[in-house]
Amino acid sequence: LKANTSPVTNTFKAATSEIKIEEKTDDGIKSEIYVKNEGTATSYVRVKLVCNWVDKDGNVSATPVPAPTITNSDWFEKDGIYYYTKPVGPKDSTANLLKDPITQPNAPEGCHLEVTVLAESIQAAPSKAVTDSWGVRVDNNGYLTQPTTTP
């Protein structure tokens, strides 16, 4: 018996978790915010909104800006960060983060509201990595949930 084999090249390509923030504005006011999964791995997404009053010279005002209220049931807030509850497949997008356009009354004189959207994604599998990295749970349906605290 004689075994004769030639080398076989196995090509493996790692999955990627890449996202793109998509915003729509209405008269310069952010009215819709989505996050699109441009990677190859199903991923979870979280977003932080940084709101500042900015004057005509680009200086940030010391006046605090309250965070906008998010009431979309596909998102939940934990420590100022909004988590999309559903895993986002490749080339898919989250639901709109905003229920209403972001507006803030009572701007300091000479200032306008500037909203910066910061987003982050993490590969959905293994779910333990999501829990360890972000401190949120993945339920039996694959949805993100806030961790429960017991007194």
Residue ranges and their predicted role:
Residues 1-151:
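Long, small/polar-residue-biased beta-strand-and-loop interaction regions
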